[in-house]
Amino acid sequence: MAVFEKVQDIIVDELGKEKEEVTLETSFEELDADSLDLFQIINDIEDEFDVEVDTEADMKTVADLVKYVENNK
């Protein structure tokens, strides 16, 4: 499974959104994700990919998060 698909699944599970709503271009603001949601998503991604996500990194879209994971796993 590709990184995007795993990240998409985590976001869908955490936010209760439909898969079609979570694309690479989707911003976390569009998904109505608050800071607690983002914390949980990042925590799940760290567990799934065995990476440490820099919370200071500027990640506004799903693509930003996917690129970060791909570059740091």
Swiss-Prot record:
Record PTM: 4'-phosphopantetheine is transferred from CoA to a specific serine of apo-ACP by AcpS. This modification is essential for activity because fatty acids are bound in thioester linkage to the sulfhydryl of the prosthetic group.
Family matches, as InterPro entries: ACP, ACP-like_sf, PP-bd_ACP
This protein's record includes keyword Ribosomal protein: no
Pfam entry (one): PP-binding
Any GO MF annotation of the entry: acyl carrier activity
Task of the protein: Carrier of the growing fatty acid chain in fatty acid biosynthesis.
Name used for this protein in its record: Acyl carrier protein
Name of the gene: acpP
